[in-house]
Amino acid sequence: MNALNQKSPLILLISIILIAIGVVWLFFGTTQASGIDNQQVTDMLGRIVEIPSETNKVASISASTTVELFMLAPEKMIGWNEKRTSEENVYMKSTYSGLPVIGGGKKDANYENIISMNPDIVLIGHGGTDNQVDQIQSKFGSIPTLDVEGDNNLTSIKPSLEFLGKVLGKKEQSDKLISFYNDITKEVNSTVSTIPESERKKVYYARDSTGLMTNPPGSTHTQLIEICGGKNVVEAPLTKGSVGVSMELILQWNPDVIITSNQQFYDNIYFNSLWADVKAVKEKQVYMVPTSPFNWFEGPPGANTIIGIPWTAKVLYPDKFQDMDINKITKEFYTEYYHYNLSDQEATNILSSSGLKNT
């Protein structure tokens, strides 16, 4: 009887330990089996958000973060913000171009549709204030939302790529893209920084079919002009959107180069008598921005315009960038970041269609 009494505390202790082990195993075993394995991250507004340790399905409700998502992890995308055109899809694999339209941007997101697709996280580009992003979070319920800053500004884009590389588990890909950006920016800047102010090209960017909608200096939509050593001729205050100008003003500014993203304007400008006396038209210095799979110049401003740096440099100063192999650069960029292997002929077609004479 005494021996039994002496063993009772030991038996009780062992029983408690076994029960505790069972509870711990049950909790963690169930958690792993259910795929619940979370981590805390601090988004780019400083919000602490709990997200899955591994993200496999990602939604984006901003065009610029959607582009970054595609460049870093296309296999994780659940869809596009809006319907893509056949022209935009020329140089995109059908695997990606065929993804569904999930609906809208920050102001008109189709929350019900996105929630039904059960993404692991939702990306919000340049979301504004904590309160504004929290309001979006409340509409997504338990699906975590992350704010990404600098995604729509080429001069401050690197932190956004670093952040997404970490969140998406694509650090190697984001590091590679940042390295590409650094190298091409350094190459272009080392040349254009030596150009005297008096010799810098005057540039006008035409946004629409009339050519009379544009963006002033300081706009993210025209920042490639300044990055590549040009001078934006528009004399208008910086606004959030585009601005309308008159033909009289354009004749007064008399740009050396005109760049446009509008195919109709590009096709017609040399036959339009209103533009005939503009220096860029007289000297055949009008260029059409490549737009497949994304615009090289803007629309949206962001990571897609990295390839626009060497292109704009060649457009503005072809004599100073004779040794830059834009064909090779284009093929590399498309392979690595647009996941499409351009043939030599396709690269040539893209560049010659833009108006570049010597590629």
Question: How would you label these PLM feature ranges?
Answer:
Residues A59-M117, I121-G128, G230-V233:
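A short, structured surface patch at a secondary-structure boundary
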Residues T155-K166, D175, Y266-T359:
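Structured C-terminal subdomain patch of bacterial secreted/periplasmic proteins
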Residues E87-E88, T129-V133, V148-F163, P196-Q223:
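Extracytoplasmic ligand-binding site segments that recognize negatively charged/polar headgroups
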Residues G104-K106, T214-G241:
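Alpha-helical, coiled-coil/dimerization segments enriched in small aliphatic residues
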Residues A59-I61, I78-N81, V101, I121-G125, ...:
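Structural recognition of the beta-strand scaffold that forms the well-ordered cores
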Residues E235-M288:
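A contiguous binding-surface segment within folded domains or other stable secondary-structure elements
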Residues N2-V67, E172-Y205, V315, F321-T359:
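Bacterial Sec-exported substrate-binding components of ABC uptake systems
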Residues M44-G46, L99-E112, L238-M247:
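Short helix-initiation/N-cap motifs at beta->coil->alpha
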